[in-house]
Swiss-Prot record:
Keywords: Disulfide bond, Membrane, Phosphoprotein, Transmembrane, Transmembrane helix, Viral envelope protein, Virion. Residues 32-44 are virion surface. The keyword Nucleus does not apply. It comes from the Viruses. The chain crosses the membrane at residues 11-31, 45-65. Belongs to the orthopoxvirus OPG140 family. Phosphorylated by viral OPG054 kinase, phosphorylation state is regulated by OPG106 phosphatase. Homodimer; disulfide-linked. Interacts with OPG144. Envelope protein which is a major component of the mature virion (MV) membrane. Essential for membrane biogenesis. Is required, together with OPG144, to form bona fide crescents, which can progress to form the immature virion (IV) membrane. OPG140 and OPG144 form a lattice that is stabilized by disulfide bonds and serves as an anchor within the viral membrane to which several other proteins important in virion structure and morphogenesis attach. Pfam families: Pox_A14 (PF05767). It is found in: Virion membrane. One of its GO terms (cellular component) is viral envelope. This is Virion membrane protein OPG140.
Amino acid sequence: MDMMLMIGNYFSGVLIAGIILLILSCIFAFIDFSKSTSPTRTWKVLSIMSFILGIIITVGMLIYSMWGKHCAPHRVSGVIHTNHSDISVN
């Protein structure tokens, strides 16, 4: 299955997963900072990794939605056919 088609089918699920990862990064950071003992590396790594993955997924979904609105293949080919004569398209 094509990756873009799969993302198009599960767009809202992937976007929600990115938002959940951002929320989890905040929770992990809160757990790490609220402890009175010295912080452990596990909570820091979980917080940083979930933040990075959440940002990548969320920004990727925004870029994908803009690609679908402005650069989808059926839109681009439609613009080419309406702006040019049949001779120049061939």
